[in-house]
Regions:
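Core catalytic lobe of class I
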Residues: 2-131
């Protein structure tokens, strides 16, 4: 596997890192990551038909530490795409901006299925392009 040597740490090239993002990013050197794609908990207290839920989907404590860590490890003039929960967009935007990110684009993806809601059928996912 090809690696890039940065500040005595080795960052694997073309690698997906899976785990607790705050812990993983603490171990990475600043300005070492080319691109971040994140689909974090949406803060909507999601529960599926079988009653399963998503960890930290009602807890906002991780927002600012996670996005501050992402900003620290992302190389200057590179991008992060972050999905978000539209009902909590104010919290996501505040966290992104507090970390130092600029919003430079908005992406909308059509889904093949509809999410349950009270008034509308949600058939799309959204993400922001951040720099």
């Amino acid at each position: 596997m090809q690696t890039n040597r940065i500040e005595q740490l080795s960052v694997p090239a073309n690698t997906v890192l899976h785990g607790d993002c705050i812990s993983i990013m603490r171990s990475l050197p600043a300005n070492s990551i080319d691109f971040i794609l994140t689909d974090p908990p949406y803060l909507v207290r999601y529960q599926d038909r079988e009653g399963r839920s998503i960890q930290n989907d009602s807890n906002t404590d991780w927002l600012i530490p996670a996005f501050t860590g992402a900003y620290r490890v992302l190389k200057q003039d590179h991008f992060m795409i972050s999905f978000y929960g539209w009902t909590q967009i104010d919290k996501f935007i505040h966290s992104w901006r507090s970390a130092g990110f600029r919003i430079v684009g908005h992406l909308v993806f059509r889904k093949q299925y509809a999410s349950k809601s009270r008034f509308l059928r949600y058939q799309h996912e959204q993400a922001y392009l951040l720099a």
